[in-house]
Amino acid sequence: KTDDMPTYNFANVVDDHLMGITHVVRGNEYLSSAPKYNLLYQAFGWEVPEYVHCAPVMKDKTHKLSKRNGDASFQDLMAKGYLPEAVINFIALLGWAPSGEYNEQEIFSLDEMIKIWDPARISKSPAIFDPLKLRAINAAYIRALPAEEFRRLADPFIDSAVHCSIDRDLLCANLQPRCEVLEDI
């Protein structure tokens, strides 16, 4: 902190311990803070979590992705009509690759990701955030939705775009195969 008090480090360790955090996955720019956290854990007599430090996610080859620089947050993506499951799937594949029978697969359920995730498969090189890849993954999730679920998710976007009486079931049946992001409506 700017007043040189380690309140953030202290609060972070206490919060993680109280939440039962066993693994901390974070950017490698935080590698130097791990010894401070470990000293706090040891001082309290608490078990130190496993740390996994990852290369940063990059906007391009020279700039880190950062919400301070106007890059989209999770909430921004939700407001644009990205599905949470698609964003999680996309982020899981940034700087990590599945192995074995899954190494060619790109679309995963959360249960599949939990089952096959291995920190040893995290790349040491920075990953570049590819918005077109995110759109493609989101499109696959949209197309896999049951029609009723697509309609429920699409309705607010239809409300803001269509101002006349229309058969929404027919509209949704035509939109779902073409829509990559709900904001496309």
Annotated model-derived regions:
Residues 9:
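Active-site beta-loop-alpha substructure in enzyme catalytic cores
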Residues 5, 14-185:
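Conserved nucleotide- and phosphate/pyrophosphate-binding catalytic cores
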Residues 1:
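Short, Gly/Ser/Thr-enriched beta-strand-loop segments that form substrate-interacting elements
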